[in-house]
C-alpha cells in the first residue's frame, strides 16, 4: 500500500498525461465538419486525440494499449503483449459497458456488447480522431454508455475540412521480441474532380508472451469520397481476420508473479495427459487451441449543407462476422448433450443412459452474424441556439452453434456432430434531440446551457438450446428507455467550469441471460431473469489553460440502480459473469495537468482517485477442505458494503516528452492500485498494485536537407521499450465463488510481459 501511495504521489508531482490544452478548438471544428458525430461538449471529462497522437508509439499493440495514458483507463490483454485479445476498463467499468462508435455507427457487438479489437488490428492507423467522454456523455447510437463513450472517425479529416489537397503514401515496418512484427502500407490519394481515397493494409504477427498465444492478424481499410462544396459522399470498407492461440485460462498466483522461479510464460490452455505403453504419464498440448474470426464492415455516408443554417447527414451500414474457436478439453459427456440420445456409441454398444463420465473431446463453438441499419442527423445552427435532431435503427441476426469433432477412447460420434444451436435477433432504435443555448457569447467569455433527450427501444429475441446447461432457452424481451441529459459550461479567459447531469439505461447482454436464466417449460416462467440497469451520473469540473500550462479537476458521482457487476467468475470463452446488485456507486476525482517546461520539454499527466462500492451486498461462498481434495464442507456468506471488483482506487499516468532537432523521446509511466477479483473484498483474491514505464524513441531523418528537395520522403526511425524496469505483474484475473478452510482461494491471473523491445 505504501508503495502504491508513493508511486501515485510521484506521478502527480512529475506531471500527468493528455492535458486538453490543444484540443478544445479541434472539438468544435470537427462538429461542424461531420454533423452526425456525437462529439462531446467541451468539458473536463473529455479527451480528444489526433491520428498522430494515437499512433506515436504504435508497434502492433491493439487500441486499448495505445490509450493507456488517458485518465482512469486500465488496459488488459490475454497474450501478455497487447497484440491478441485486448480489453480496457474506464473508471472500473468494463469494455462491454462503454459505448463505442466508428463514424457514428455502433461498434459494440449487439449481443455481447463487446468490441473485439483483435478483429481489426491496427485500426488506429486509419483513424483521423478519437474522442473519449468519461461518464454518460451526450446521446449516441448503439449500446448505453455506463462508464464512458468513445467516438472514432476514419479517413483524412483535413480533406473533410478542405485544408489539405496532397496525395500521401506511408510504409511502416517494425519488429521486436516474441517474434512480433507489424507491416503497414497506407495511401491518401487525391483524384480529379474532387474525389479522394484512402487505403490501408496491415499485417501483425506475434508469438505472444504466453506460450501458444500466437497471433496471425490482418486488417484493411478503404474509402472513396466525393468532397463538394455543399455535399460529401463517402463509401467506406474495412475489416480484418484473426487467428490467435488461447490464453484466457489464466495461471495461479505464483506463476503470474514469478514466485519461486515459476515460469511466467506458462499457459495451461490445450494441456492434456497422455499415457505411454509402459504406463507412464506425460503432458502434451493440443496444437490448434485457437480462436478464428473474420469481420467485414461497409458504410455509406452522405453529408449535405441544406442552407447556411441546416446541415444533414445520413449513414447506411452493414457488418458481417463469422468464425469459431476450437478446444481440446476433458469434459463430462453431458456437456455435449450426449447422454441417452442415441448419438454416441462405444465400440459396437450404446453408452448406457445416465453414465456421465469424463472424456477428452475436440469441439468448436461457431458464430455467424449480420448487423445492418442506418443513422441520420440534422443540425440547425443559429445564434444563440443550435439544435440537433437525430436517430438510428439497427437490426442484428446471430447464429450460434457447436460441433463435436472427436472423442477419445473409441467413443464414436458423427462427423461434425452439432450438439447445440441457438439464434438471436435484436432490434435497436433511438431518436434524440439536443440543444445548446449560448447565454453569453463574447470573445473572452461564454456561458452555454445544453439539454439532450433520447428515447431508445430495444427488442431481444433468442431461440434454441442454451450452451451453458444444454436446456432450451426461448426468450423475447422489450425495453423502453428514456435518457435525459443536461449541462452548463462557463469559459472566461482560460477558465472553464462545467457541470452536468445524465441518466442512462442499459439492457442485459446475451451472456447475462444465458448464464443466469433458467426456463421452466412447464410453466413458461423464467428464473433468474436479469434486470435492466440505470445510472444517474453527476459531473462537475474546472480547467485553467495558459499558454505554457494547463490544470484541471473533475468530480463525479455515478449512482447505479441494479448495476450488473462482474463477479470474478468467467465462462468457457473467457467472458466474465455478472449479477445485478440493487444499490452501488462510483465516485471519484480526476486531476489532469500539463506544462511546457521549455521549447524542447513538456510533461502531461493525470491522477484519478475513486471509491467504488456495493451497498448491502450478499454472496454465498462454498467452503472446501483443501485444493487437493475439494471436499465440500459447507457455505459461508459475505454481507455488507464491499468494493466493486476490478475497480482500483488509484490510477495515474505520467508522460514526459523531449523534442530536439528531429529527435523525440517520451517516457510514460502508469500506476494502478490493487484490484479485487470479485466483490467479497478478499485480500486472497486480488490483483497486486503495479507500475510500468515505457520508453519511446523516434528520430526523423532530415531528408529535405539531405536531398535538397521540398517533396523528399519523410523517414522516421523508432524504438519502443515497454516495461523498462521489468515489472512482474498481472492486469487481469478471476476467482471462483469458493474458499478453502485455510482461507485461500481458487484464483487465476493473466501474466504480462516483462521488458520487451520493438523497433522500426
Could you tell me what each predicted segment is?
Residues 6, 238, 284, 435-436, ...:
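Conserved C-terminal beta-signal and adjacent last beta-strands/turns
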Residues 20-56, 95:
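Short, acidic, small-residue-rich periplasmic hinge/interaction motif at the N-terminus
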Residues 64-106, 128:
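Extracytoplasmic beta-strand/coil segments of soluble accessory domains associated
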Residues 106-136:
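Short acidic/polar hinge/loop motifs at secondary-structure boundaries
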Residues 139, 148-189, 200-211, 424, ...:
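Short strand-turn segments of transmembrane beta-barrel domains in outer membranes
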Residues 175-205, 210-247, 293, 298-309:
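Transmembrane beta-barrel wall of Gram-negative outer-membrane proteins
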Residues 457-466, 476, 490-539, 550, ...:
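Surface-exposed extracellular loop regions of Gram-negative outer-membrane beta-barrel proteins
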Residues 557-559, 577-679:
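Gram-negative outer-membrane beta-barrel transporters
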Amino acid at each position: 500500500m505504501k508503495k502504491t501511495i508513493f508511486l501515485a504521489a510521484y506521478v502527480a508531482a512529475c506531471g500527468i498525461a493528455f492535458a486538453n490544452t490543444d484540443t478544445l478548438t479541434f472539438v468544435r471544428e470537427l462538429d461542424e465538419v461531420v454533423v452526425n458525430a456525437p462529439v462531446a461538449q467541451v468539458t473536463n471529462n473529455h479527451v480528444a486525440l489526433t491520428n498522430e497522437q494515437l499512433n506515436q508509439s504504435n508497434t502492433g499493440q491493439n487500441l486499448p494499449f495505445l490509450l493507456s495514458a488517458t485518465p482512469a483507463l486500465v488496459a488488459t490483454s490475454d497474450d501478455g503483449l497487447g497484440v491478441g485479445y485486448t480489453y480496457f476498463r474506464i473508471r472500473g467499468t468494463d469494455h462491454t459497458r462503454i459505448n463505442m462508435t466508428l463514424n457514428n455507427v455502433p461498434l459494440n457487438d449487439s449481443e455481447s456488447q463487446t468490441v473485439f479489437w483483435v478483429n481489426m488490428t491496427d485500426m488506429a492507423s486509419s483513424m483521423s480522431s478519437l474522442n473519449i467522454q468519461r461518464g454518460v456523455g451526450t446521446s449516441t447510437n448503439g449500446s448505453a454508455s455506463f462508464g464512458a463513450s468513445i467516438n472514432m472517425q476514419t479517413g483524412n479529416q483535413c480533406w473533410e475540412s478542405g485544408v489539405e489537397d496532397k496525395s500521401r503514401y506511408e510504409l511502416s515496418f517494425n519488429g521486436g521480441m516474441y517474434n512480433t512484427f507489424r507491416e503497414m502500407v497506407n495511401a491518401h490519394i487525391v483524384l480529379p474532380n474532387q474525389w479522394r481515397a484512402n487505403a490501408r493494409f496491415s499485417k501483425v504477427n506475434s508469438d505472444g508472451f504466453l506460450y501458444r498465444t500466437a497471433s496471425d492478424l490482418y486488417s484493411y481499410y478503404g474509402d472513396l469520397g466525393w468532397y463538394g462544396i455543399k455535399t460529401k459522399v463517402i463509401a467506406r470498407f474495412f475489416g480484418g481476420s484473426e487467428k490467435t492461440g488461447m490464453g484466457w485460462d489464466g495461471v495461479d498466483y505464483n506463476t503470474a508473479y514469478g514466485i519461486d522461479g515459476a515460469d511466467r510464460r506458462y499457459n495451461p490452455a490445450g494441456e492434456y495427459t497422455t499415457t505411454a505403453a509402459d504406463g507412464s504419464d506425460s503432458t502434451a498440448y493440443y496444437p490448434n487451441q485457437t480462436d478464428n474470426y473474420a469481420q467485414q464492415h461497409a458504410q455509406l455516408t452522405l453529408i449535405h449543407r441544406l442552407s447556411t443554417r441546416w446541415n444533414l447527414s445520413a449513414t447506411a451500414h452493414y457488418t458481417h462476422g463469422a468464425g469459431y474457436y476450437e478446444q481440446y478439453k476433458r469434459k463430462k459427456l453431458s456437456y455435449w448433450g450426449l447422454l441417452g440420445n442415441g448419438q454416441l456409441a462405444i465400440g459396437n454398444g450404446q453408452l448406457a443412459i445416465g453414465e456421465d463420465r469424463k472424456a477428452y473431446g475436440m469441439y468448436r463453438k461457431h458464430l455467424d452474424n449480420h448487423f445492418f441499419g442506418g443513422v441520420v442527423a440534422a443540425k440547425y445552427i443559429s445564434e444563440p441556439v443550435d439544435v440537433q435532431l437525430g436517430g438510428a435503427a439497427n437490426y442484428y441476426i446471430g447464429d450460434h452453434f457447436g460441433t463435436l469433432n472427436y472423442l477419445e477412447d473409441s467413443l464414436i460420434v458423427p462427423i461434425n456432430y452439432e450438439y447445440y444451436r441457438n439464434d438471436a435477433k435484436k432490434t435497436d432504435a433511438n431518436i434524440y434531440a439536443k440543444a445548446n443555448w449560448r447565454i453569453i457569447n463574447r470573445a473572452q467569455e461564454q456561458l452555454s446551457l445544453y439539454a439532450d433527450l433520447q428515447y431508445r427501444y430495444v427488442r431481444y429475441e433468442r431461440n434454441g438450446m442454451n450452451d451453458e446447461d444444454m436446456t432450451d432457452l426461448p426468450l423475447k424481451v422489450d425495453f423502453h428507455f428514456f435518457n435525459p441529459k443536461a449541462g452548463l459550461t462557463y469559459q472566461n479567459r482560460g477558465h472553464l467550469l462545467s457541470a452536468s447531469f445524465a441518466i442512462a439505461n442499459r439492457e442485459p447482454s446475451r451472456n447475462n441471460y444465458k448464464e443466469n436464466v433458467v426456463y421452466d417449460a412447464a410453466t413458461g416462467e423464467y428464473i433468474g431473469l436479469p434486470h435492466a440497469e440505470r445510472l444517474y451520473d453527476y459531473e462537475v469540473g474546472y480547467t485553467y489553460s495558459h499558454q505554457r500550462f494547463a490544470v484541471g479537476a473533475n468530480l463525479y458521482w455515478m449512482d447505479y440502480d441494479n448495476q450488473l457487476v462482474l463477479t470474478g467468475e468467467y465462462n468457457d470463452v473467457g467472458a466474465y459473469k455478472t449479477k445485478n446488485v440493487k444499490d452501488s456507486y462510483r465516485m471519484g476525482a480526476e486531476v489532469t495537468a500539463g506544462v511546457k517546461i521549455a521549447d524542447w520539454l513538456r510533461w502531461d499527466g493525470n491522477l484519478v482517485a475513486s471509491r467504488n462500492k456495493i451497498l448491502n451486498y450478499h454472496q454465498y461462498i462454498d467452503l472446501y477442505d483443501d485444493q487437493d481434495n475439494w471436499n465440500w464442507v459447507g457455505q459461508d456468506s459475505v454481507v455488507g458494503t464491499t468494493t466493486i471488483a476490478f475497480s482500483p482506487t488509484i490510477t495515474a499516468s505520467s508522460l514526459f516528452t523531449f523534442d530536439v532537432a528531429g529527435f523525440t523521446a517520451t517516457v510514460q509511466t502508469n500506476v494502478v492500485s490493487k484490484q479485487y477479483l470479485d466483490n467479497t473484498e478478499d485480500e486472497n483474491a486480488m490483483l497486486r498494485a503495479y507500475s510500468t514505464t515505457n520508453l519511446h524513441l523516434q528520430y526523423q531523418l532530415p531528408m529535405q536537407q539531405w536531398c535538397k528537395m521540398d517533396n523528399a520522403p519523410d523517414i522516421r526511425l523508432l524504438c519502443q521499450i515497454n516495461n523498462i524496469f521489468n515489472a512482474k505483474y498481472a492486469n487481469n484475473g478471476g476467482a471462483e465463488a469458493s474458499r478453502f478452510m485455510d482461507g485461500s482461494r481458487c484464483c487465476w491471473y493473466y501474466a504480462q510481459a516483462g521488458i520487451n523491445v520493438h523497433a522500426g
